[in-house]
Structures are given as C-alpha cells and as structure tokens.
C-alpha cells in the first residue's frame, strides 16, 4: 500500500548476484493511518532472493521526514547486508537536505511475509506486520525517527503486556 508517487525508489543487486534489493521512497500508507504516509519515519528495504524468490522486508528509519521533508532516492549494495541509502528533499542547494547513510540489515528483524516477531502477526491484506493489532506504520504514526525506534523497542521488551 504505497502512497501515490511514493513507490519503490531504488533497486540494487548484491555483489554476489544473489539478491535484488529495493527501498520504498517513504512509509507505506497502512490502514488506520490518518493523513499522508510521507511524514511517518519508517520506510522499508525489501529483499528478494533471485534463486528462491523469498521476500524479506526490513524497516529503515528516515531522518525525521515530518520536519526535514526527506524521502529515499537511491540504494546501493556494498555487501549482502550493507547498503548506502540516499535521503533527500525536493529543495535545491543551499537550502536542500541531501544525505547518504549506511544501512546494515545483518542483525535486522524481517517484518515481511516470513516475519517471526513475538506478539506480531503478518497480514498482507491489513498492511503487513501487525503489532498491538496495528500495522507498524500506523502504530508509530507521525513522530521522530528516534521516537519510532523507541516505540518499536518497547514493544519488543519482555515487560510489554503482549509478552
């Protein structure tokens, strides 16, 4: 469920030619999310095994898009799990906001169709991985990247009521 003109923005193949990797330009528009998905600080990195066609999804925290207006422009594979990600806004320099980040999914949690997240259920028809009965993007809503990551970490905490 992508927002109009906010789809898969970059594609790359890992150096060993085993995996196609893409990244969504911004957050997915999930059920229950009020307004635009653009200011939600979670995009997705999607991997597809070229041998088995297995799909995995990983959350990528955008740098405060509600404030910075950034979205993802490109992704480049440095290894099977390490990527350069270009975030940018639509402004020209010197006011523009353009940065390149390193994203490492080596120890990241798959939130895609094969997700095995404690307390989570994957429902493609309802926006993907559900935590506390809501899709991830709807759950974190419009917030900072730090607040979104903190919220997701608190859900994974052994003291959370769903554990």
Language model feature labels by segment:
Residues 1-163:
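Sequence/structural signature of beta-propeller domains
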């Amino acid at each position: 469920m992508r927002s109009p003109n906010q789809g898969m923005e970059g594609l790359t193949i890992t150096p060993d030619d085993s995996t196609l990797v893409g990244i969504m330009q911004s957050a997915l528009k999930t059920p229950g999310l009020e307004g635009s998905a653009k200011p939600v600080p979670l995009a997705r990195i999607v991997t597809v095994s070229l041998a088995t066609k297995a799909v995995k999804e990983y959350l990528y925290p955008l740098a405060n898009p509600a404030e910075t207006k950034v979205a993802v422009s490109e992704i480049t594979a440095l290894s099977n799990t390490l990527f350069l990600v270009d975030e940018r806004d639509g402004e020209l320099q010197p006011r523009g906001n353009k940065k390149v980040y390193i994203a490492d999914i080596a120890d990241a949690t798959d939130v895609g169709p094969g997700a095995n997240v404690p307390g989570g259920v994957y429902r493609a028809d309802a926006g993907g991985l559900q935590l506390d009965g809501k899709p991830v993007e709807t759950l974190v809503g419009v917030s900072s990247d730090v607040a979104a990551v903190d919220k997701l970490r608190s859900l994974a905490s052994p003291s959370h009521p769903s554990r």
